[in-house]
Amino acid sequence: MRIFSGLFLSFSLLGLVACGLQKTEDPNQSKTSQQQLRIAVVANGTSGGLDFIGVPQLIAQDPIFLKALKQKNIELKWEPVTTAAVATLVNESFINNKIDFAFYGNLPAVVLNATGVRTQIVVPGGVGNNVYLVVPADSPIKTIEDLKGKKIALHRGRPWEINFAQLIQSKGLKLKDFQIINLNPQAGAAALSAKSVDAFFTLSDALTLQDRHLGKIIWSSQSLSADWKMRAELWGRKTYLDQHPDTTQLLADATVRAMQWISQHQDEFQQSQTKFGQPLSVIQRESQNTSSNWQQDWSPEYQVDFLKQHYAKVIDHAVKNQLIQTPIKAEELLNAQFTRQAIQNLQPLDIQHKQGN
């Protein structure tokens, strides 16, 4: 699912860990937020207004959601973050009790929980985004094995680091087998274009590089299962979930409604995402998964076993690579009740829609 199709963001992950943040939450901290619902979201202002990427834009326009909040006298407060520093800003905002929810990726969320600030997945992110390994257009390199000892641009601490680790481990390789150059996607693309690196591991911007004849994709996750995709979810502060379950349910309902609408309006949704800078052809090809279809990609089903296994892998990677100092349990990151109830709440509305009522 493309909750965050613009997750190529800078994240000073190692700096956060090095600070040794071990902040244990005070359950009373969130009480000041009783009349507010504060959500961090990737925002883009290039279109003239403030637009949110993906699902949050639909939530912000959902009349059912907005009416319910108004009736309960709850102020909806969006906390825009730029694509330059999403994970850093989101984690800092959670730590400083400035937000209650955020749409963002798996590895930063694990790092946050290791500091003692507890969050849980309220609504899972469907199938996730594809990841790609791209080399210069005229490179003779054909496989990840051919890159052993060579320079690979990879933005460390970002969610797709997990996918890169998964790829090399599947070939019996380790990070130390490569010269990893820590570059954000913009710098990584420039480095590949200048041939100052031998490869670049990234998201759908690899398709743009290929279209411009600056690179060629030698591996992608498009034909692989959801376990190979980059994940982003709707995360909520645990103390808020415990203290305000009704408000949390309203947000979960709105998120599931948005996902349902997207699953039924592929062309319209994809066209709407072009305002954030990617060509329509790139957006369309990014979604061409061969192991699932569009409707399945946007399913909000809360697959506990799958998520537990996935986040156990993320935690293991974070521990082994010293990205976190305190191991956490994958099951503590999960909270399926809100999504499951949201799916039940959606069904009567879906029936009415089909009947034309």
Functional labels for PLM-detected ranges:
Residues 136-151, 242-246:
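Flexible hinge/capping segments at coil-to-helix
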Residues 181, 186-277:
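Pocket-lining segment of extracytoplasmic ligand-binding domains
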Residues 45-47, 244-325:
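Secondary-structure end/capping motifs
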Residues 103-115, 165-166, 197-217, 310:
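A ligand-binding cleft/hinge motif common to bilobed small-molecule-binding domains
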Residues 315-357:
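Conserved C-terminal helix/tail region of periplasmic/extracytoplasmic solute-binding proteins
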Residues 15-18:
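C-terminal motif of bacterial Sec signal peptides marking the signal peptidase cleavage site
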Residues 77-92, 105, 178-193:
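Short helix-initiation/N-cap motifs at beta->coil->alpha
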Residues 43-77, 115, 167, 310-313:
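Short, polar/charged alpha-helical segment
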